[in-house]
């Protein structure tokens, strides 16, 4: 891990901890932007579940729209917006390649989830057409009955993705739109640079 990458990661960790201790309702909420093979973009909000020097992890159905995008075009952009921080909010952008996390990591995280969240992962055919709410509730009841009295295992089609950063951008809001921006970026040889940008 290079010094500049370590610096960017430490900056994120400091801001993330600040957001977790602030008035933010859900500091871990992030927008994940993907694209399909045709280049059509898509974005949605998911929750960050872990981060370290290897990257930023979230979990989902692998056959969801984002899961399919990431398996066919393994690049993503993450966006955190913490409006309550500092003078006028902070925004962090992270861009990078994407990897599936190991089955062991996915199993460990799935086992830590509330039981009803585990059941929901089995009952939901994420991103597929649903005829009615009652149909979903019936699927939930069926899964509850199937696993009554025993642990709920992780579905084969559910797992984690790790975004491996190739760029970080930190935006510090200020009055009169006189913001401050810093960008950290890796080149093709994984050499990191840091520069200030006009707001």
Swiss-Prot record:
Organism in which the protein naturally occurs: Xanthomonas campestris pv. campestris (strain ATCC 33913 / DSM 3586 / NCPPB 528 / LMG 568 / P 25)
Protein name per Swiss-Prot or TrEMBL: Pyridoxine/pyridoxamine 5'-phosphate oxidase
Similarity-based family: Belongs to the pyridoxamine 5'-phosphate oxidase family.
Subunit structure: Homodimer.
Pfam families, sorted: PNP_phzG_C, PNPOx_N
Disulfide bond residue pairs: none
Residues that bind FMN: 44-49, 59-60, 66, 91, 126-127, 171, 181
Pathway annotation from the record: Cofactor metabolism; pyridoxal 5'-phosphate salvage; pyridoxal 5'-phosphate from pyridoxamine 5'-phosphate: step 1/1; Cofactor metabolism; pyridoxal 5'-phosphate salvage; pyridoxal 5'-phosphate from pyridoxine 5'-phosphate: step 1/1
Lineage of the species this protein comes from: Bacteria, Pseudomonadati, Pseudomonadota, Gammaproteobacteria, Lysobacterales
